[in-house]
């Protein structure tokens, strides 16, 4: 199994972004959704992205943002990848000069494969926990047995991951990448560097155990 990529989402401070990169994270996520306790404004986001070392991917998370809002942010912040967490259609996600991930919130009975197929231009599909009225960052895991064996695209697993359970998640789901936010925080929006390192180590050690 190839090395699983790791994204630390909900970054709000330069020091947390640098700590994530130093721990070995492949990507950091910035939340552009005002209702989130982890939201960042354009000025802070630009500061964080500019501080990143080479080869660490910057991801912008959006929830039902307008094209005007997206354009304003993308003109100011050099994001590498977009992540759509709302009710966006495929056409809403495309045409922004960036590759994108589409997040799908999982609940029993979902046709996940069919829903994913509605986004043929997506670079990958992120699966997160369904909580009514909450687009993400719930801190709750979902039933990993619901994850299809093949989505036809890279699978990013999110939802309630922590240093304690991510090894089991990687072993069971075999995702392309894992995405964590609350599971490595000291408080909402503030990362705990020790928990970030523990999370990365748990993913990497699982990979080593399989080689």
Curated annotation (Swiss-Prot):
**What Gene Ontology biological process does one annotation of this record name?**
L-tryptophan biosynthetic process
Q: Does the keyword Lipid biosynthesis apply?
A: no
Q: Which residues form a coiled coil?
A: none
Which is an annotated GO molecular function term of this record? phosphoribosylanthranilate isomerase activity
Catalysed reactions listed for this entry? N-(5-phospho-beta-D-ribosyl)anthranilate = 1-(2-carboxyphenylamino)-1-deoxy-D-ribulose 5-phosphate
Instruction: Note the Pfam families from the entry.
Output: PRAI
Give the matching InterPro entries: Aldolase_TIM (IPR013785), PRAI_dom (IPR001240), RibuloseP-bd_barrel (IPR011060), TrpF_fam (IPR044643)
Record flagged with keyword Amino-acid biosynthesis: yes
EC number of this enzyme: 5.3.1.24
What protein family does this chain belong to?
Answer: Belongs to the TrpF family.
- Name of the featured protein: N-(5'-phosphoribosyl)anthranilate isomerase
Q: Which organism is it from?
A: Pseudomonas aeruginosa (strain LESB58)
